[in-house]
Amino acid sequence: RDEVAKAGITAILGAGFDPGVVNAYARLAEDEYLDEITSIDIVDVNAGTHGKWFATNFDPEINFREFTGVVYSWQNGAWQTNQMFEVPREWDLPVVGKRPTYMTGHDEIHSLSARYSQADVRFWMGFGERYVQVFTVLKNLGLLSEQPVTTAEGQEVVPLKVVKACL
């Protein structure tokens, strides 16, 4: 941030949707539509299906890694921590209807909380019941670990990479 300011240029954080477009929408809302921002809740949910018994929405290794750590949110002017799937919330959304979501950590929470420190900033992601169940079993069995293990045949494998290969 300091280097960007010193250079007199504007840096774009993320080129995707979240972070990226979400940050631009927040700034647009601040500049054009709202007198005060007290909370920012980003809801990432869809009604899609992969037609498979189980699938992730994007690269399984990245997807699982994102959800095995601590969930951070910015609330009441301070960082709050939770475990994945600890804080549920149902949203009733246009087009997709009622969908269960869980508070999840995500990159834009950090950038938005820096600009809107007075606001609660949370990220919610939709997961179906099957996803939550499969994720929980894989995690409890140690299959989402990035630490190598040695098989009975003496081969060293990383459980998370094996799960990814199987999906």
Q: Could you tell me what each predicted segment is?
A:
Residues I9, G14-A15, V45, N76:
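Fold-independent oxyanion-binding glycine-rich loops
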Residues R1, D18-V21, V43-H50:
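Short gly/pro/ser/thr-enriched loop/turn and capping motifs at secondary-structure boundaries
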Residues R1-A11:
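Rossmann-fold NAD(P)-binding glycine/threonine-rich loop
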Residues I12-Y25, E30:
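Short alpha-helices
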